[in-house]
Amino acid sequence: MTTTAQVREAFMPLVARHSDLVLIGRFLIVRPVHHILRGVFVDRSSDKRSFEPHIVTYPLVPAQETVMLGWNPVWLYDQSVGMWDVTKPDTITAIRHHIEAIALPPLRAIKTFDDYIAHERAKSTTFYGHFDDRVFTNILVAAALGDFSKALQLRPQDERIERYFAKFAPDFFPALESGNREFIANTLHQWEAATVKAFKMEHIWKPTPFPLEI
């Protein structure tokens, strides 16, 4: 498996070339970070010489403790290159160019929740299904957008969601039902801050109002 030091050696040249990139551990993140985390997560592989980079996008809510690939990550692969071999300089150069050409343009285009939704809906549904079926995420996105009716309409679709909110945010759905925008906004901000702290991203996070507050 590749090491974090090898990831840093391979991808810091990208950070040097692009002022909106920062590397935190294995995560090459596009700045600014507001509500949506955008980047390339350079995962380990069963082969000690190989990187497995994925395009990753997901909201900072709910509160998360560890970096994850999120829903339906896009594996960056170039058939003409094959395995991203850390021991081959030409391969490392190729992966940098691949990220610049394939990953960065769509990631940079995601600036709002609507952009995020469009990005997720455009992904292949072969292995993970359609984004609109991701009930939990869509409840939170609808709440962030201020569409409380949609968030409440999605609520009955999954009993696991009821258990989650009963444990971590029992007042969330009652606040949606009463139209308490201040409570929902404060809850989302607290979750974002917790995720940012866990991911050690305080220095690149730009706290901003949610659409429901504007």
Protein language model features and the residues they cover:
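Short, charged low-complexity linear motifs
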Residues: 2-3, 177
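Long, charged, glycine-rich C-terminal linkers/tails
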Residues: 25-30
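Intrinsically disordered, low-complexity regulatory regions enriched in serine/threonine/proline
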Residues: 33-214
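Amphipathic alpha-helical segments
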Residues: 3-22
